[in-house]
Design a protein with these regions (language model features):
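Conserved CoA-thioester-binding segment of acyl-CoA-metabolizing enzymes
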Residues: 1-79
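Crotonase-fold acyl-CoA enzyme core
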Residues: 130-244, 278
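Interdomain hinge/lid region at the active-site interface
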Residues: 269, 277-281, 287
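Hydrophobic/aromatic residues within transmembrane alpha-helices
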Residues: 34, 71, 90, 154-156, ...
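Glycine- (often His-adjacent) and acidic-residue-rich active-site loop
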Residues: 41, 73-128, 176-178
Length: 303
């Protein structure tokens, strides 16, 4: 069983090579479902988990026939029936400088001692955050249970969040374990819910329900638990019916207001690519290759 609320008829496996996550594609929809699959530890991530998550997200990014990513957590845990989206970094593998590969991890078999040393302490969940942020398609956090610490920050960086009315809980524990997300997890949360409320979330370490999270603006909608994945799929199908170019440009336009020069570069790069597709730009290219002056006079100066 993938997850208790997973519909096996709606999805097909992309690969079974992952240990800590599952990766499925919609049978009849251009949507993928990527899920943490460590329910017994509330879907906490270790370095190998992050490697797999990055690989799956990057694969989805490159698929021209995939328009939306659902990011969720499988469950419940067999031991106590608990649900989780992600409980953040697995503290049992946290070393002095970050999260450490163990000898039974694939990356723990690295022969190059310099690579092993560089991997001694990882915090590369931040690379996943950036990948989600710059993904040219919507990423929806589908939260069936606990979103804690680094898992809380992951849902924050996603474009949208849907949460289980009954089981979703939002808790920021970073200061409790001597950690802090000084980037998207905190600053972007403040953009979503306001400075005072975001500081409360981090400074108090209070648990919030799905309804409370929706009221403050960090969750789009609280959904009955049994309907959560079906509603997420419906939202994804609505979004993938839109213009891919418009959706990509809209996401980058929303990002640009908060992402500084990097956001401008991403948006401008996409605008340049659109310009390349015009006859006017192609005339400039052809004139250069043919060693002649471009005939731009036939193109109007739009206003």
């Amino acid at each position: 069983m993938v997850s208790e609320i997973f519909d096996p008829d709606a999805w097909e496996s992309v690969t079974d090579e992952f240990d800590d996550i599952t990766y499925h594609r919609g049978v009849d929809a251009p949507v993928v479902r990527i899920a943490f699959d460590r329910p017994e530890v509330r879907n906490a991530f270790r370095p190998g988990t992050v490697d797999e998550l990055y690989a799956a997200l990057d694969h989805a990014r490159k698929q021209a026939d995939v328009g939306c990513v659902l990011l969720t957590g499988n469950g419940p845990a067999e031991s106590d029936g608990g649900w989780a989206f992600c409980a953040g970094g697995d503290q049992s593998v946290r070393g002095d400088s970050g999260y450490e590969y163990r000898d039974d991890d694939e990356a723990g078999d690295e022969d190059d001692p310099l690579v092993r040393e560089a991997r001694a302490g990882r915090l590369h969940i931040l690379e996943v955050q950036r990948l989600i942020r710059f993904m040219p398609k919507p990423v929806v956090a589908v939260v069936p249970g606990w979103a804690v610490g680094g898992g809380h920050s992951l849902h924050v960086v996603c474009d949208l969040t849907l949460a289980s009315e009954e089981h979703a809980k939002f808790l920021q524990t970073d200061p409790d374990v001597g950690s802090f997300d000084g980037g998207f997890g905190s600053a972007y949360l403040a953009k979503q819910i306001g400075q005072k409320k975001a500081r409360e979330v981090f400074f108090r370490g209070k648990t919030y329900s799905a309804a409370e999270a929706a009221d403050m603006g960090m969750v789009n909608e609280a959904v009955p638990h049994e309907e959560l994945e079906a509603v997420a799929r419906k939202w994804a199908e609505e979004m993938t019916a839109k213009s891919p170019t418009a959706m990509r440009m809209l996401k980058y336009a929303f990002n640009m207001a908060d992402d500084g020069m990097v956001g401008q570069q991403v948006f401008a790069g996409e605008a340049t690519r659109l310009a390349y597709m015009t006859e006017e730009a192609q005339e400039g290219r052809d004139a250069f290759l043919e060693k002649r002056d471009p005939a731009f006079e036939e193109y109007p100066w739009h206003y």
